[in-house]
Amino acid sequence: MAVKKYRPYTPSRRQMTTADFSGLTKKRPEKALTVPLPKTGGRNNHGRITSRFIGGGHKRLYRIIDFKRRDKANVPAKVAAIEYDPNRSARIALLHYVDGEKRYILAPEGLTVGQTVNAGPEAEPKLGNALPLRFVPVGAVVHAVELVPGKGAQLARSAGTSIQVQGKERDYVILRLPSGELRRIHSECYATIGTVGNAEHKNIVLGKAGRSRWLGRKPHQRGSAMNPVDHPHGGGEGRTGAGRVPVSPWGQPAKGLKTRKKRKISDRFIITRRGGK
């Protein structure tokens, strides 16, 4: 995928870039693999805002992605199309299995229409194949990695991300995550070979506020622009400082406070925290 630039015939067009969508081979999604995606506006079932700055945006259909692939072990599938998915930064690939079923998976970099992919312990460690980590060679690059066997992929699902297999010990495989963290993952967890495609996504510049609204993002209001009743930074005549350590609307320090629970059960699996600590 390449990034498309524009002539600056308006101020917002000067910096704006978009994806050129040249790698896509199908425009309409597979109807049987889509479900409605109702808007919440950031509200819960009581109508109260639980996630601020969410609302509006273009209507979307959710594409059902197969993040497990376990039940299709040793059933080959041909890549029928590479498609756009508005719900994620990565592209998705439509698979046609030899038993007649169709499914979506995340499209790794380099996957093309007509290629055959497979899954299961007997699958070869090649691009697009999903297999348990114990069968993935050390040094290989993977994505869509499970944290718990059978739960489905949770790690490295965004465009351009990947995880490297660093080593193996007993029932665990040591992985280097995109954050730099070294972590043990159970060897029965599935992973897909390759890097997630559409790596140029990070270079896209929205260019104008309205384009952010199309994505369902509302303006992020500063606390210092509010009244004291609304935020700890609010109030004062003219522009005034917070007068305290910067905090969230609920008083929690906002700059560098550690929020991870102490003695969390998964700490035993983390060898090196992100940032090399």
From Swiss-Prot:
GO terms for biological process: cytoplasmic translation. Keywords: Ribonucleoprotein, Ribosomal protein, RNA-binding, rRNA-binding. One of its GO terms (cellular component) is large ribosomal subunit. Transmembrane segments: none annotated. GO terms for molecular function: rRNA binding; structural constituent of ribosome; transferase activity. NCBIfam families: rplB_bact. Part of the 50S ribosomal subunit. Forms a bridge to the 30S subunit in the 70S ribosome. Belongs to the universal ribosomal protein uL2 family. This is Large ribosomal subunit protein uL2. The lineage of its organism: Bacteria, Thermotogati, Deinococcota, Deinococci, Deinococcales. The gene is rplB.
